[in-house]
């Protein structure tokens, strides 16, 4: 029986100090990257993981529907965001790696990666939306704080 080669890279698993995360709606701000670099020196473990989400918009019968998956252009855009953030972090002399995760539940995935990699901090941009739009789209920072409140991981929200 032939084994098929996976079409994706294996998820990094080594411990890191900081997870720089985005829910995939916007690129990382320079303030957020600078905050992640500053917090890395406070962490007992060195390194920064850059993580962004390519959102799956729905399922049919428990299977991702091809028309609701992120397009190649969206995935490439998210990859470029991650690469630019990694370049900026590496210019500061800090080890960094990154990944683009495809999921329906961005907050759950970010929390899972932070816990698996034993991070001390998760740094996210604050939500720009106000009022009803914020209620509908959600606030990644407050949702992450709620999800990670019983862990040792501190969520840092950088205001926009």
Outline where the language-model segments fall.
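Glycine-rich, Arg-bearing micro-motifs that act as flexible, cationic patches
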Residues: 124-147
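Structural beta-alpha unit
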Residues: 1-8, 90-122, 160
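A structural motif corresponding to the C-terminal end of an alpha-helix
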Residues: 82-98, 148-152
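General small-molecule cofactor/ligand-binding pocket signal
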Residues: 49-51, 97-101, 154-158
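A short acidic, glycine-rich active-site loop
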Residues: 67-80
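Well-ordered alpha-helical segments embedded in enzymatic catalytic cores
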Residues: 31-35, 81-84, 109
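Intrinsically disordered or low-complexity boundary/linker segments at protein termini
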Residues: 1-32, 142-160
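Small/aliphatic-rich secondary-structure junction motif
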Residues: 10-67
